Each structure stands twice: as structure tokens, then as C-alpha cells.
């Protein structure tokens, strides 16, 4: 069976990616990161999801919080803003996060003989993070095949971002078709320890709109309601 490393945050998108990779016949090696994020409830969710969905293995890598300063997701002195339509990169951007995550996933993949890496990045219904764009994914794949023994020997890596051009509605519909239990997931940037979502941040808003427009019951437990 082919192996794939799946970046699993515990959120809606990465869980859909895990389900999709499994549906394509991959033995999935889930990889999560603890980097001082205030929404640590997502790591508990990732553990539940990996077990529930039968991942071949699930590793949680702890990174030095000092690597990720200046973000509302890692710095308690910076408030997570309520949702606002804007083309600007918000304070919830974590410096080079996906680059670091993918680099570690690449090393892990090469070491276990996997040549596919799945990431739930999307450039639709997102917060304009630069490391979610298709240009970034394509460039990282090129790097992966230039920087590894496997790559230069022709055993090439593929960075799979199957949600890249899907809206949140389409992602939820896909997950529903794959039987994803979204009640296990946590997407909120500031979920409490019980995994209850704030209902006001960008991630909550995109998620809530997505379920409503997809016509799928929203299993999320919200602390507050947001009008959509």
C-alpha cells in the first residue's frame, strides 16, 4: 500500500484531506504540530480524528514557540480579531508556518518511503495567507524534488493540496460524501479547552457559512453566535 504523510491540524480542511487520502488507497501517516497555538484544543481533536479514521500512525511534533512570534495565534497579547472582509493578511498569520510544517513532513515522508504529502491549503474562502496559495504549493514541490535524495534520483514527491480551489461549501460537501464526522473537528482560532468555538473569528465564520450554504447540519459547539 502506498504511504502518504497528511498534515493534520484537527480542523475541517485537514480532516477532509485525511479522508480523501484514505479514499485514494493511501496508508496515512498523520503529522500534527504543537507550536504554542492558543487553540490547542485542535491537537486533542487531531488525536481523536487520527484514531477514528484509522491513520497508520499519528505523530505530534513540538516546536519552539519562539519560532512563531508576532501572531495572534501564538501571542496572548495580540487579540484574535472578529471576522472582517479584507484583502489584507490578518494578525492571525503565523510566520512561515506551512513552509516549516511541509519541510518537516518532507523529511518524515522520505524517511518512511512516502512520496505523497497532503495539506489542506485552500485559496478560496481563506484569510489571504501567502503560504496557502497555489504558487507556494507548486514552488515547495519543486524544492522537495531538488532537496532530497529521492527527488534527484527520480523518485519524485507530490505535494497534494486537493482543496486548493474548493470553496468551504464544496469542501464540506466532499467531506460529507466521504463520511467525515465534522463533529470531531475544531477549527476556531481561540477554541476553549472543551473545544467550543468562539463563533466570531475568520475561521468560525467561514466554517459556519460553509455548513449553512452546503445544507449540512453544523455540528460545531459555539460559545457565541455570529450572524451570517
Curated annotation (Swiss-Prot):
List of residues binding Zn(2+): 188, 198, 201, 204
Q: Which GO terms describe its biological process?
A: queuosine biosynthetic process
Domain of life according to the entry: Bacteria
* Cofactor(s) recorded in Swiss-Prot or TrEMBL: Zn(2+)
Q: How is the cofactor bound?
A: Binds 1 zinc ion per subunit.
Main EC class of this protein?
Answer: ligase
Q: Which PANTHER family match?
A: 7-CYANO-7-DEAZAGUANINE SYNTHASE
Q: What is this protein called?
A: 7-cyano-7-deazaguanine synthase
What is the source species? Legionella pneumophila (strain Lens)
Q: Which gene encodes it?
A: queC
